[in-house]
Amino acid sequence: MVTKDMKESVRFYRLLGVDVTDPVDDHLDATLPSGVRLMWDALELIKQLEPDWEEPRGHRRIGLAFECSSPGDVDATHARVVKAGFRSKKGPWDAFWGQRYAEVIDPDDNVVDLFAELPTPTA
């Protein structure tokens, strides 16, 4: 992910449970428990490495979703992110596909989804 503000981006993703070290330069990466690696590069570094690089335009430049431990955790995570000063795109709702869902916006205007499976209704 290319970021305009490394420290603010790290602060946001820590609220979502990403265990990431404090940034010390223009590149940072974190390995999630599943083995997926998230990597950040400062906008200044990218412009230095690729002078012709242009920032992507439009909505949903990346697709990133974090699974929460429960429907209540979706609500709590959304509230924690918003309370920390970040924006909500859409507050928690029960989606027709069987998940509790919410959308928040990271410091670089990427929409990040939060979700958890809803309990299966009993007859």
What are these regions, as identified by a protein language model?
Residues 1-4, 23, 29, 31-32, 38, 52-123:
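Vicinal oxygen chelate
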Residues 1-47:
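Core segments of cupin and vicinal oxygen chelate
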Residues 1-11, 16, 61-66, 116-123:
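N-terminal beta-strand motif that seeds the catalytic metal site of vicinal oxygen chelate
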Residues 8, 42, 52-55, 59, ...:
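A generic structural signal for ordered alpha-helices
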Residues 11-15, 77-82:
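Short amphipathic alpha-helices in soluble, non-transmembrane regions
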Residues 16-21, 69, 92-94:
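Short linear motifs in intrinsically disordered
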Residues 46-52, 121-123:
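A short, acidic/glycine-rich surface segment
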